[in-house]
C-alpha cells in the first residue's frame, strides 16, 4: 500500500522510492488542492522529472513557460531547469511524478511535512532542507 504524506494543500502517495528501485526512480502521485502552488520554485542537478496528468489541470512553470498538464498529458523537466507548479482551477488535480534516477525517496517530503505542520514554516529551515536533498531554491521573481 502506498505511503501518504500530507503537505498542507498537497498530498503525495509514494509508490516507489529510491530504496525500492535500487536508485532507478522515485514515483509518487500528487494531489494539488484548488488554488494551491509549489511554495518554492527550484531546480535539481542530479535528476530529471516527468509529470503525467491524471485528473484536472495543473499548470507547470518550466524554464519561464507555463505548461498546462491535464489527463493523459505529460511534461518532462530535465535537470538544471527551474520549475514550479500551481492548480489555478476550482477542483483538486492529480498527477503522477517520476524522478529519474531516484534520489529523494519519501524522506525529503516527510521532513518538509514536519516543517509545514508547525504552522508558518521558517523559510531558512525550508531552504536548508531543500539544499540537503539536492533541490536548489530560486526566488519566485526569477521563475
Residue ranges and their predicted role:
Residues 79-106:
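Ligand-binding loop in jelly-roll beta-barrel domains
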Residues 64-82:
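Short acidic-glycine-tyrosine-enriched beta hairpin
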Residues 6, 14, 97, 137-139:
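Structural signal for conserved beta-strand scaffold positions within catalytic alpha/beta enzyme cores
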Residues 110-143:
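Acidic/histidine-enriched, glycine/proline-rich intrinsically disordered or flexible terminal extensions
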Residues 8, 61-65:
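Short strand-coil-strand connectors
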Residues 5-41, 47-48:
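A short glycine-rich, His/Asp/Glu-containing loop-to-beta-strand
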Residues 29-33, 43-61, 98:
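Short, conserved beta-strand element in jelly-roll/cupin
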Amino acid at each position: 500500500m502506498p505511503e501518504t504524506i500530507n503537505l498542507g494543500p498537497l498530498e503525495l502517495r509514494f509508490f516507489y522510492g529510491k530504496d525500492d528501485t535500487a536508485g532507478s526512480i522515485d514515483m509518487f502521485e500528487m494531489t494539488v488542492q484548488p488554488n494551491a502552488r509549489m511554495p518554492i520554485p527550484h531546480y535539481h542537478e542530479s535528476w530529471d522529472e516527468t509529470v503525467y496528468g491524471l485528473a484536472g489541470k495543473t499548470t507547470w512553470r518550466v524554464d519561464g513557460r507555463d505548461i498546462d498538464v491535464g489527463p493523459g498529458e505529460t511534461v518532462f523537466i530535465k535537470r538544471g531547469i527551474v520549475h514550479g507548479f500551481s492548480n489555478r482551477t476550482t477542483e483538486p488535480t492529480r498527477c503522477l511524478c517520476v524522478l529519474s534516477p531516484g534520489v529523494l525517496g519519501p524522506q525529503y517530503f516527510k521532513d518538509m511535512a514536519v516543517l509545514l505542520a508547525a504552522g508558518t514554516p521558517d523559510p531558512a529551515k525550508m531552504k536548508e532542507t531543500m539544499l540537503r536533498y539536492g533541490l536548489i531554491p530560486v526566488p519566485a521573481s526569477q521563475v
